[in-house]
């Protein structure tokens, strides 16, 4: 017989048959036999906490038998794709068994710890993003924040302020102010004094007094009633006339003394005229009072309503003479 290769005995393990220890996951998994051949072993442990796989006990028996693979495969040269796939399946099987051994509480604590570990990382990433900005970008962002309200203010300032006259035309007010009212009232009184008109009053015989004056219309408080018309004389002439009138008992006293611009004057209304101001009777609680009215720097004595006066009411004012001689001569001055 010629020279050649010796025939190998069946079942000696050289033709690629795997031993029982390799099938059952014995010690040959970590220490495989190396007889000059390349051996591929997979032992890396990867813990998948997010999606744990099912335990091999949950698989059906048929699937368990079909899933049995060899941990060790001897091949000459490069490993085939089938051996790689078988090694990956075996790794997943080992990982699933290890995960199933861990209790559920431990897995929950580990998941919580992972969540707590990931959350601050996200916050730090946001802070790191802000810190990672260059200084120029930071200044620009700050300027943008500061300029935003300023833009609003400028827009408000630029917006035109609408006035009431933009919608409604200007009309002259018919209302009169205080100065205008006083000026018109003065002009009216000046006209009445200069013309001698006496409106709203008349002479009336009063029981126990004689002649008197009553109102023929209503007067409001502060309204002009009538002028005490007479001769305007100085104090020296007034004293001389008063002495002469005192000699005649039939002559009454119609003299009124006052001061104007630090000068004493007297209005002598003793002479009988058609003016009604001289006929108004005396009363300490009268409804009228005297007031000086200037017309071209000439004082005039007028009577003004102290309160509202009704129609038919007698006009009265206080003569102001408190001298004893006058009271003795005219006792009605006491009232």
Curated annotation (Swiss-Prot):
Region (Disordered): 1-91, 133-183
Binding site for S-adenosyl-L-methionine: 209-211, 254, 281-282
SUPFAM superfamilies reported for this sequence: SET domain
Covalent S-S links between cysteines: none
Name used for this protein in its record: N-lysine methyltransferase KMT5A-A
Matches recorded under Gene3D superfamilies: SET domain
UniProt key word NADP: no
A single cellular component GO annotation: nucleus
Role according to the record: Protein-lysine N-methyltransferase that monomethylates both histones and non-histone proteins. Specifically monomethylates 'Lys-20' of histone H4 (H4K20me1). H4K20me1 is enriched during mitosis and represents a specific tag for epigenetic transcriptional repression. Mainly functions in euchromatin regions, thereby playing a central role in the silencing of euchromatic genes. Required for cell proliferation, probably by contributing to the maintenance of proper higher-order structure of DNA during mitosis. Involved in chromosome condensation and proper cytokinesis.
Domain SET stretches: 199-320
Subcellular location per the Swiss-Prot or TrEMBL entry: Nucleus; Chromosome
Top EC class, one word: transferase
Biased composition (Basic and acidic residues): 67-91
GO molecular function: histone H4K20 methyltransferase activity; histone H4K20 monomethyltransferase activity; histone methyltransferase activity
EC number: 2.1.1.-, 2.1.1.361
Keyword presence, Cell division: yes
Assigned keywords, A-Z: Cell cycle, Cell division, Chromatin regulator, Chromosome, Methyltransferase, Mitosis, Nucleus, Repressor, S-adenosyl-L-methionine, Transcription, Transcription regulation, Transferase
Sequence similarity: Belongs to the class V-like SAM-binding methyltransferase superfamily. Histone-lysine methyltransferase family. PR/SET subfamily.
Catalysed reactions listed for this entry: L-lysyl(20)-[histone H4] + S-adenosyl-L-methionine = N(6)-methyl-L-lysyl(20)-[histone H4] + S-adenosyl-L-homocysteine + H(+); L-lysyl-[protein] + S-adenosyl-L-methionine = N(6)-methyl-L-lysyl-[protein] + S-adenosyl-L-homocysteine + H(+)
Domain of life the protein comes from: Eukaryota
Coiled coil, from the record: none
Any single GO BP term: regulation of transcription by RNA polymerase II
């Amino acid at each position: 017989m010629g020279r050649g290769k010796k025939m190998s005995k069946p079942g000696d393990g050289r033709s690629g048959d795997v031993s029982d220890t390799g099938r059952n996951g014995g010690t040959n998994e970590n220490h495989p036999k190396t007889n000059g051949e390349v051996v591929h072993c997979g032992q890396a442990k990867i813990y998948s906490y997010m999606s744990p796989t099912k335990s091999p006990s949950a698989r059906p028996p048929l699937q368990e038998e079909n899933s049995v693979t060899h941990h060790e495969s001897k091949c000459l040269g490069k490993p085939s794709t089938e051996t790689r796939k078988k090694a990956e399946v075996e790794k997943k099987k080992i990982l699933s068994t290890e995960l199933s051994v861990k209790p559920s509480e431990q897995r929950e604590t580990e998941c919580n710890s992972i969540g707590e570990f990931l959350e601050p990382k996200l916050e730090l990433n946001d802070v790191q993003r802000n810190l990672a900005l260059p200084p120029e970008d930071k200044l620009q962002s700050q300027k943008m924040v500061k300029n935003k309200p300023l833009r609003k203010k400028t827009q408000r300032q630029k917006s035109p302020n609408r006035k009431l006259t933009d919608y409604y035309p200007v009309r002259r007010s018919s209302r009169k102010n205080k100065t205008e009212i006083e000026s018109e009232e003065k002009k009216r009184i000046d006209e009445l004094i200069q013309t001698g008109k006496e409106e709203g009053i008349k002479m009336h015989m009063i029981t126990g007094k004689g002649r008197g004056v009553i109102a023929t219309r209503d007067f409001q408080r502060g309204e002009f009633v009538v002028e005490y018309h007479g001769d305007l004389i100085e104090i020296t002439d007034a004293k001389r006339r008063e002495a002469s009138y005192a000699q005649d008992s039939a002559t009454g006293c119609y003299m009124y003394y006052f001061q104007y611009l630090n000068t004493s004057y007297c209005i002598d209304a003793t002479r009988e005229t058609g003016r009604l101001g001289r006929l108004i009777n005396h009363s300490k609680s009268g409804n009228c009072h005297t007031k000086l009215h200037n017309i071209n720097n000439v004082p005039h004595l007028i009577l003004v309503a102290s309160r509202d006066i009704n129609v038919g009411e007698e006009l009265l004012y206080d003569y102001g003479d408190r001298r004893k001689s006058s009271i003795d001569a005219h006792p009605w001055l006491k009232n």
